[in-house]
């Protein structure tokens, strides 16, 4: 257990990418740029041990995957989709009327978007729902999913989620090579305008490498959660909230903050007991051993200071009055209030996207939303009257900046 002062002194959660990957990723990207589909098939064989004749799956395969779902799985995916869709429709930015002002903004959906869906050890239909639904609501014209190939075939639930969300193209390719393909295009894969979705360090570094040639959502690090709890919290539930993050990755970070030392000690005992038989024990044990923190705060203000310093991907408040933290906890990817709003609900069915900022980037950026799949530009349409009211000031500023043709462009209209 750490005091708030000890924690704040030691805390530095800004993970840097492994610089040794730069050369590997740059070589992969260059190879895909030059060799196209051939490079993708070679990398599928090299990295995933899968020989791929066709990179693109047929739309009929997506529909078949959906049709073959059992009722419980279909209902779960559909409910998740509907909740995400309704939430995103509610927060979608509304077009301003050109009748109300001479200066306003217009929004347009991005033309083509690529979504990375992780594969390998686990499959994530929820990632499809939490990204492609947003693109669909935004009105993106062409939604492309890339996901690593499997010898047994792509996870059927992932394909079904692609069908539900109206994905236009699904390609069997993963890793840095898929990011390169989406950026540069190949014989089969069209280049996109923006790439979103989580992945491993190779994917993260590839997104960083191609940024500027294509838009990206973020460069994601390991998952993280910070919880503020008091004596009213259900400590068994809190332990599983901690395990739920820790089971993702040995590097996953979990923080529990309380003003009550006894509560933290009790929680620690429960966590250690449950660790003996918890599923995915190997991953969870490593995460708990290296990236789990119990932090004792002196008061609510100090607890919030710690939370805002961590700026976690997920923040959970499980106290008697969680609502009192709404305005005090500012820098988090998503804020979960109360016993019945565990972070895991946000992973699957709450409505907001689970693609959230990590590594303290919540201090300056936001979780993925429908509006990230749209562009905006300002429109300026002045009347002669308004022009005459502002022209002299504009002309004068141009003059003091010695931009004389700017000045003349205004002057000739007066």
Curated annotation (Swiss-Prot):
GO CC terms in record: cytosol
Active site: 313 (proton acceptor), 314 (proton acceptor)
UniProt entry tagged with the keyword Cell membrane: no
Highest taxon above the source species: Bacteria
Enzyme Commission number(s) of this protein: 1.1.1.23
GO terms of molecular function: histidinol dehydrogenase activity; NAD binding; zinc ion binding
Pathway of action: Amino-acid biosynthesis; L-histidine biosynthesis; L-histidine from 5-phospho-alpha-D-ribose 1-diphosphate: step 9/9
Keywords: Amino-acid biosynthesis, Histidine biosynthesis, Metal-binding, NAD, Oxidoreductase, Zinc
Binding annotation for NAD(+): 116, 177, 200
SUPFAM superfamilies registered for this protein in UniProt: ALDH-like
Cofactor(s) in the UniProt record: Zn(2+)
Entries under Gene3D superfamilies matching the protein: 1.20.5.1300, Nitrogenase molybdenum iron protein domain
Binding residue positions for Zn(2+): 245, 248, 347, 406
Reaction(s) the record says it catalyses: L-histidinol + 2 NAD(+) + H2O = L-histidine + 2 NADH + 3 H(+)
Residues binding substrate, per UniProt: 223, 245, 248, 314, 347, 401, 406
Biological processes per GO annotation: L-histidine biosynthetic process
Details of cofactor binding: Binds 1 zinc ion per subunit.
Family: Belongs to the histidinol dehydrogenase family.
Cited HAMAP family: HisD
Biological role: Catalyzes the sequential NAD-dependent oxidations of L-histidinol to L-histidinaldehyde and then to L-histidine.
Protein name, UniProt field: Histidinol dehydrogenase
Native species: Staphylococcus epidermidis (strain ATCC 35984 / DSM 28319 / BCRC 17069 / CCUG 31568 / BM 3577 / RP62A)
Gene: hisD
